[in-house]
Each structure stands twice: as structure tokens, then as C-alpha cells.
Amino acid sequence: MIMKELYAQLGISSAVYDFGKTVEDSLKERFEKFDKTAEYNQMKVIHAMQKNRVSEACFGASSGYGYNDLGRETLEQVYADTFHTEACLVRPQITCGTHALAIALFGNLRPGDELLSPVGKPYDTLEEVIGIRPSNGSLTEYGVKYRQVDLLEDGTFDYENIKKAVNEKTKLVTIQRSKGYQTRPSFSVKQIGELIAFVKKIKPDVICMVDNCYGEFVDTIEPSDVGADIMVGSLIKNPGCGLSPIGGYIAGRKDCVENASYRMTCPGLGMEVGATLGVNRSLYQGFFLAPMVTKGALKGAVFAANIYEKLGFPVVPNSTEPRQDIIQAVTLGTPEGLVAFCQGIQAAAPVDSFVTPEPWDMPGYDSQVIMAAGAFIQGSSIELSADGPMKPPYAVYFQGGLTWEHAKLGILKSLQYMVDKELVKL
């Protein structure tokens, strides 16, 4: 059976297949660059694992308090060495990226301190953590003030107003690397380093925290290499590569990580407790494979950008821009387009492919959201997934794919659904 016939069995028409193949053939040089980045990052991870003498004993389970968990302690040192930080928390008790960010914020801020976002509004779920949207237990309720400096119209930092916003009470600056549910560009590690240097020149003792979700292993360096005091991420995104069943990490300066640990558990216990309950093997294996899986997700994102840009849709990043994370935003312009795209992604999944996603009132968001994720791990966005808020400009955010081939199928399937509903013409 030839490849085209196999795709036909999966519901891909000849026209969609041919269109996709033409696009794929034009991307060989771009894909080779991703291969080189992945190889570099793979060697970084292997070196850190060998340096810390990872052994079979590290895969054992701990229970109860989790004292002296060799696997947990070694894994945290592997992360710290890979990311070039003094310390790192890597815990299954951290439920998601938002939780990791909240732990870091509450652990390092005190009543009367000010939190500054110099990159505009943070991700929707962080609004209630901070208190931008009123919520019980927010930072605002605990007396932490929040300031925000929006980006300039071209998506760059407003240095003039950032300088005005930083004052003697500014304790922590939070920088979201990825675009979130926005159509602004995601930031490069170099840009983040320049922003951190600018802020620290004004106030050297300010803590700079980077939300690194969706950004790990996209480049050969991380925000921790350019001055970030804290770097936060989720294990059901890039560093877990679809194998980690749960978890998050907080890496950075030893004092900042320790402060976060007292919020994760409690004062006096900090990093010393936290049973791993048998997940260590998956956390290690996920981190080991993460550079390769991230590479496949990047190829899928670039493929999506090229497909939809050729059809006239605004895409961020565009088809030729450098990649700073694995997310591809496509502005579809209509609710019908957003729904069709997500339903196509779902139909390409190995799990729950028969399910039809519909918009729903998702906790933490101010509008209905549609999500497609036929994943092995619930909510895993390093696996093939797409989502978007049901409000103008009806942009979809596509990411993931444990293999490039699966990401490719997902994009072709999304296009097929839009063609079938007469939302696009090839």
C-alpha cells in the first residue's frame, strides 16, 4: 500500500495530501536546523544524567513522608545541571504549570511587595492567582500589589514605561515566554536576557522569574542561562515528553527555590518531604526523550504555519520566523473555523479520536474554550493538541505531537475538516 492510500484510510483526501506534501518538501532545510538543536540538547541531558550517576535505584518508589528519596533528589540535580541552576524542585505534587507559578510567586512574595509583569497580561489562569480577576486566596488578598506594562504595538518591550514601573517595592518581575492566548510573538531567550539585564540595572535585587512553559529545549540555551532567578514549567509539556503523568518544576537560585519549597509543603519541611509513589522512572525517561519530542513538535508547528499562511490565514509566528516555543497560533476569524480545526485535530488522535470536542465553560477562563486533546496524559500539551477561546479573533493555538508524523497528520486532518465544511478552498 502506498503512503497516499494509507492517508486516505485516515480520511485525508488526495487534494489535501498533495497540498501537504508540497509544503513538507519545502521545509527540509528548516527541519535540519531543528535536528541539530535537538542533538545538542540531547547531549546536555545525557551529560547531566551521567554526571549525577543515575542508576536503577533511582527508579524506586517512596511513600509516606518521602524522606531520602534517592530518585527524587537525583532527578532534581539532573534538572539543575541541565538548566545550569543552583537548585531545582521537580515534583509530582505540582499539579500543573499554573500551580508551579503560584508556588514560586507565593513563596517569594510578601505583603507589601509589588509584582510586575513587563510583558502585558499573563496567561488567563494566572489572573486569579494574582488577583487581576478577584478570587479567594489570590496574591492581592494577601497584600501583594500588581503592576503591568503592556507591550508596544509591534510586540516589543516598552522599556520607557518599564523603567517608570520599577520602584523600591518591586520584589519580583514575572516574564511569560510564550504567547498564551494572545497573538503577540513569543520571546526568544536573547530577548528575555536583555529584559532581565535592563530591569536589574534599575533594581539589582529584584527577582526575575520566567514562565518557561512550552519553551524548554526549543533553543540550545534557556532563560536560566541569561539571568533568570527562577524558571518554571510543567512536566506535562516539553520536559515530560508525554511520559510524565503529572508534575512541574521550579529551577533557579537556591534561596528562591527553597522559598518556593516552603510554599509547596510548609515552613520547616520544604524540599525534604514529598513521596514520589513510583513515578520516578517516567519522569527520568520523559526528560531524557524531551529534546527529541520537542523537535517533532517544532516541525509540526512550522508545518502548520506554512499550511495555513498559504491559505491566507494570519499566523504567529509566521512561516519563516525563528521558533521560541512549540505553540502555533492561527487566526481563523470565525467560530466555525475554530471549531472545525479543533475537531480535525481530535479526529487525528490515537486516543478518543471518535469524540467531537465542543466549546465549554472551563475553570479559570473568562470565556468558553474549545479543546482538542486525544492524549495519553490528560491535559498534556506536548501531545498533539489544539485549543482556543470562543471569542474574537477566534485564534486557535496548536501545539505538540509526540512524533512529527502524528503532528503532520493532525494538521492535515484539521485542514480536511475545514475543506469539508467549505471554510477553505485549495
What are these regions (language model features)?
Residues 309-426:
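Conserved C-terminal alpha-helix-loop-beta "cap" of PLP-dependent enzymes
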Residues 62, 82-85:
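Flexible linker/loop signature enriched in Pro/Ser/Thr and Pro/Gly
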Residues 86-89, 113-116, 171-172, 205-208, ...:
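Structural motif
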Residues 63-71:
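N-terminal small-domain helix-loop-helix segment of the aminotransferase-like
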Residues 2, 6-24, 28, 35, ...:
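Conserved PLP-enzyme active-site core in the AAT-like
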